Amino acid sequence: MARALVLLSVVLVSLLVNQGTASENQRLFNNAVIRVQHLHQLAAKMINDFEDNLLPEERRQLSKIFPLSFCNSDSIEAPTGKDETQKSSMLKLLRISFRLIESWEFPSQTLSGAVSNSLTVGNPNQITEKLADLKVGISVLIKGCLDGQPNMDDNDSLPLPFEDFYLTMGESSLRESFRLLACFKKDMHKVETYLRVANCRRSLDSNCTL
């Protein structure tokens, strides 16, 4: 009888620990989604404010740039459409999100110059800090998915895209700024999508359609 009570106690403790871990992971996922959603909204606001300050002819010329031919993150392997995204594992989506966020740590420092004339966008200098916080959160989620297993992802050992990509393209300052903002918005939209689907992957019964 005593042995049965001990076993029951062990099972109950294990269930409570697992429940607590699942609850903490859900909290981390929710925070990550909220953070990247804020960054995506901020990116959209930044580029809208930038475009509002352009002359009609400047706006017409820059409209030819998008859809973008090249972004700093284009060398990072990622799902190319909704179907591929939905078929990707939670771990894969987290790893790609981590790489995308990491690729913006240096370029984000130049965003303040791109929107220096905007008074409604907030403080762009805080973006680098927000990206760093999000990167840490995603890293914790990746470790949780690995559950003590070694990280065997080959992409983690690859060098990041060129840090000064947006500063060495030989374009005018106007085009550089527009490309920087457009690529930032594009990548934050990607990460938001990947994190939402990854979060949905945690529930096998969920419909993770985009």
From Swiss-Prot:
The keyword Signal applies. Keywords: Disulfide bond, Hormone, Metal-binding, Secreted, Signal, Zinc. It comes from the Eukaryota. InterPro entries: 4_helix_cytokine-like_core, Somatotropin, Somatotropin/Prolactin, Somatotropin_CS. Zn(2+) binds at H38, E192. Disulfide bonds join C71-C183, C200-C208. The keyword Zinc applies. GO terms for cellular component: extracellular space. One of its GO terms (molecular function) is growth hormone activity. Residues 1-23 form the signal peptide. Pfam families: Hormone_1. GO terms for biological process: animal organ development; growth hormone receptor signaling pathway; positive regulation of growth; positive regulation of receptor signaling pathway via JAK-STAT; response to nutrient levels. It is found in: Secreted. Belongs to the somatotropin/prolactin family. Growth hormone plays an important role in growth control. This is Somatotropin. It comes from Ctenopharyngodon idella.
